[in-house]
Amino acid sequence: MDIIMQKRNEVLAQNVIKGLESRNMSGYYAADREAAVKQALELIPEGSSIAMGGCTSAHEIGLIKALEDGNYNYINRAKMSPRESLMAAYDADVFLSSANAITSDGVMVNIDGNSNRVSCIAQGPKKVVFIVGMNKVCSDLDAAMKRARNVAAPANAQRFEVKTPCKTAGKCFDCKSPDTICCQFLITRYSRHKDRIHVILVND
């Protein structure tokens, strides 16, 4: 990554972290993927049960492999029914997620189809750890909503066997398709419980 952009991300991340802290959430900056994995493991005690809500970021940085290789109870939802997976996630010590977008003052936006991910972010698991790339930082809530709907959702639609306008055109049409993956919108602006929500901002 260009050194100038890296410096910009470092400065921006500190502002996001301040915003998160003002909202009773914790923020961290990781200069690369390895640092992000190290920070995540510092937040997850050995022996913890860990669930995940379709977080490709956790796979991409190598966190899931580290958990599977370590002394952790990683809940593999691919081996469970949707209902079993949801109940296990609610009861987990740690829930891993990404965010579709985050504002520069620490407000997160997430869109969900089945709603298992946003429901676990809102309540249930004792701790939620977000892995968020700096490319997801937006100037304000309006920009964050636009990113979630016009960038994140159309990209995520490519991962699933769905028939939605955004999958074929690459942008949001505010559709009501039976296959829509935009059923629930969750805006996380404050955490009722201190030390529950942790956000790792990754310079990647």
What are the language-model segments listed below?
Residues 1-9:
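Glycine- and acidic-residue-enriched helix-capping/strand-helix junction motifs
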Residues 3, 25-27, 134:
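Short, flexible active-site loop motifs that bind/organize anionic cofactors or intermediates
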Residues 9-96:
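N-terminal active-site beta-alpha-beta segment that forms phosphate/nucleotide-binding
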Residues 90-204:
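Conserved phosphate- and dinucleotide-binding cores of soluble alpha/beta proteins
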